Amino acid sequence: MRPLQIVPSRLISQLYCGLKPPASTRNQICLKMARPSSSMADFRKCFAKAKHIVIISGAGVSAESGVPTFRGAGGYWRKWQAQDLATPLAFAHNPSRVWEFYHYRREVMGSKEPNAGHRAIAECETRLGKQGRRVVVITQNIDELHRKAGTKNLLEIHGSLFKTRCTSCGIVAENYKSPICPALSGKGAPEPGTQDASIPVEKLPRCEEAGCGGLLRPHVVWFGENLDPAILEEVDKELGRCDLCLVVGTSSVVYPAAMFAPQVAARGVPVAEFNTETTPATNRFRFHFQGPCGTTLPEALARHENETVS
């Protein structure tokens, strides 16, 4: 069997955020190795020794909080799937419809709270930090539930629902207004028969920087867009330094994030996957724990009997 060939980290920033891997890496990442272990006791031994832990999280973590994933057969908003709306072309063609979609998603988050998985991660970061150990979360989620749970060392590689970027001046700003603009009040209903609001572009969210007034867009990475090279540089540093990696609630099919954990595993670092099902990358990892993250993570990340807090 050929050894796994890892794409050089400098190439990661050149990859697109798509649903399929680049052709040159598709077969490399999914090579199957020995069946992973499901021994929590063995994982806990690795956890007890780890000084620099990276946790890569995906939609499965937030799904347990009731956050819509917009994936699979039921993943529709009106008659569209996320990949129909979360693109630069869709925004250029119909910014009103795209803003209705994101307004709906922002409003939904008002009633959602971090679950036991989010809380276990945040508590672990705080606890281990007092011991001089580092925990970093690299998330593909844009819902800010990790932040809400108390996670501080957080890299949101796909952006945030609660940040905007001006299409004219480029300013990125936090925005928690509800609604984000008056014209979106009461809009965004997800039912299939709902008609588009067709809001005039001048009434959509606008930049408040002096002298600008440009059209705002959600500060999220859309299909076909590159990830922020600065964030990916930070990701690369964390992946290169970690001595334990957890892959939590991610399908391992969205690139380039799907390459992160295999990159770590290839240098011999223990990687543990926590998911409700196996993924294309499962057999690349040392551990696999099947079940809801809100059930498996609290046990996995709980205080070890030999832990001491300075």
From Swiss-Prot:
**Binding of NAD(+), residues:** 58-77, 140-143, 249-251, 275-277, 293
Q: Which residues are recorded as binding Zn(2+)?
A: C166, C169, C207, C212
Q: Transit peptide span?
A: 1-36
Annotated InterPro entries: DHS-like_NAD/FAD-binding_dom, NAD-dep_sirtuin_deacylases, Sirtuin, Sirtuin_cat_small_dom_sf, Sirtuin_class_III, Ssirtuin_cat_dom
Q: Which cofactor does it need?
A: Zn(2+)
* Record-level GO BP terms: protein demalonylation; protein desuccinylation; regulation of ketone biosynthetic process
SUPFAM superfamilies linked to this entry: DHS-like NAD/FAD-binding domain
**Residues noted as binding substrate in the record, renumbered to the chain:** Y102, R105
Classification via Gene3D superfamilies:
SIR2/SIRT2 'Small Domain (3.30.1600.10), TPP-binding domain (3.40.50.1220)
Q: GO CC terms for this protein?
A: cytosol; mitochondrial matrix; mitochondrion; nucleus
Q: Where in the cell is it found?
A: Mitochondrion; Cytoplasm, Cytosol; Nucleus
Which part of the chain is the Deacetylase sirtuin-type domain? 37-307
Which reaction(s) does the protein catalyse, per the Swiss-Prot or TrEMBL entry? N(6)-malonyl-L-lysyl-[protein] + NAD(+) + H2O = 2''-O-malonyl-ADP-D-ribose + nicotinamide + L-lysyl-[protein]; N(6)-succinyl-L-lysyl-[protein] + NAD(+) + H2O = 2''-O-succinyl-ADP-D-ribose + nicotinamide + L-lysyl-[protein]; N(6)-glutaryl-L-lysyl-[protein] + NAD(+) + H2O = 2''-O-glutaryl-ADP-D-ribose + nicotinamide + L-lysyl-[protein]
Quaternary assembly: Monomer. Homodimer. Interacts with CPS1. Interacts with PCCA.
Free-text domain note: In contrast to class I sirtuins, class III sirtuins have only weak deacetylase activity. Difference in substrate specificity is probably due to a larger hydrophobic pocket with 2 residues (Tyr-102 and Arg-105) that bind to malonylated and succinylated substrates and define the specificity.
Read off the HAMAP family from this record.
Sirtuin_ClassIII
**The family this protein is said to belong to:** Belongs to the sirtuin family. Class III subfamily.
Known function: NAD-dependent lysine demalonylase, desuccinylase and deglutarylase that specifically removes malonyl, succinyl and glutaryl groups on target proteins. Activates CPS1 and contributes to the regulation of blood ammonia levels during prolonged fasting: acts by mediating desuccinylation and deglutarylation of CPS1, thereby increasing CPS1 activity in response to elevated NAD levels during fasting. Activates SOD1 by mediating its desuccinylation, leading to reduced reactive oxygen species. Activates SHMT2 by mediating its desuccinylation.
> In its UniProt entry, what is this protein called?
NAD-dependent protein deacylase sirtuin-5, mitochondrial
Native source organism of the sequence: Macaca mulatta (Rhesus macaque)
